[in-house]
């Protein structure tokens, strides 16, 4: 039984491109070794009329004892190694950020509230000690005015550097000593603080009549001492009460004036 060679195609079908190239190889190949050698295809299909014997070039067939793992029908894909690395890095970064935020919150709490021991000792001392004569006490007989209480800073807790900075309006210690530390004391912040006789308003604050505190505290003290003299004094004075916001604005204006006075004069570029 003779098999048809690749150079002689069968009569009933059209020769393929490979067969035509094999037949015309002598026209474009000069070496006889290359002409006599036939190149096998990369992937050989099933046994055909041109293959005298079957040859498995892709490896031995799988044994029946080791079946192939069937693919799961679910569309869920396994995560890639690089995605696992990115997920772990993101998780570690979030954990470190949360830890830093917790540390920062604890530091701020310690700065503004002090240590827990100081808070406990100050609360115990405030409950045992009577109220200071110049301090502010909440009225017990007026429950409807509880929502309108004036905010008074507590001075029992130890002051931190940030609190000293804000209490002294950001000024240097030398300038605070020159101006007088009593001007920046917490007692002067309350609504019942009144200017001392003989003191002049700071420079840059405007008229002397504007640098006045609320007359509510003075009216209360005068009313406790002398009856209706407080009402007569307030009617005779006729000055409006100064709010905390307006007082802070005047302090900022005064600080800005001090800064401009200390700095060199600026020339106008217009």
Curated annotation (Swiss-Prot):
The entry sums up its family as follows:
Belongs to the FAM110 family.
UniProt-annotated stretches for the region Disordered: 1-83, 117-142, 186-244
Q: Where is the composition biased (Low complexity)?
A: 1-16
- Return the Pfam families for the record: FAM110_C, FAM110_N
Stored InterPro entries: FAM110, FAM110_C, FAM110_N
Q: Where is the composition biased (Basic residues)?
A: 68-78
Protein name in UniProt: Protein FAM110D
């Amino acid at each position: 039984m003779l098999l048809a060679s690749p150079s002689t195609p069968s009569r009933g079908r059209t020769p393929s491109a490979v067969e035509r190239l094999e037949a015309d190889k002598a026209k474009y190949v000069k070496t006889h070794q290359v002409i006599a050698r036939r190149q096998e295809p990369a992937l050989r299909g099933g046994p055909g009329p041109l293959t005298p014997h079957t040859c498995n070039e892709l490896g031995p067939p799988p044994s029946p004892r080791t079946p192939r793992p069937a693919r799961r029908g679910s569309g869920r894909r396994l995560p890639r190694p690089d995605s696992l690395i990115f997920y772990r890095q993101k998780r570690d970064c979030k954990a470190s950020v949360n830890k830093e935020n917790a540390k920062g919150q604890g530091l701020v709490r310690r700065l503004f509230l002090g240590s827990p021991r100081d808070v406990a000792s100050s609360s115990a001392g405030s409950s045992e000690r009577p109220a200071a004569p110049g301090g502010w006490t909440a009225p017990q007989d007026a429950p409807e005015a509880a929502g309108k209480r004036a905010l008074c800073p507590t001075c029992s807790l130890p002051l931190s550097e940030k609190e000293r900075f804000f209490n002294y309006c950001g000024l240097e210690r030398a300038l605070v000593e020159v101006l007088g530390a009593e001007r920046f004391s917490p007692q002067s912040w309350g609504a019942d603080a009144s200017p001392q006789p003989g003191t002049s308003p700071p420079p840059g604050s405007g008229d002397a009549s504007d640098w006045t505190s609320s007359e509510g505290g003075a009216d209360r003290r005068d009313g406790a001492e002398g009856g209706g003299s407080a009402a007569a004094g307030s009617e005779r004075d006729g000055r409006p009460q100064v709010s905390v916001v307006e007082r802070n604005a005047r302090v900022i204006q005064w600080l800005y004036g001090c800064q401009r006075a200390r700095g060199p004069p600026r020339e106008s570029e217009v």
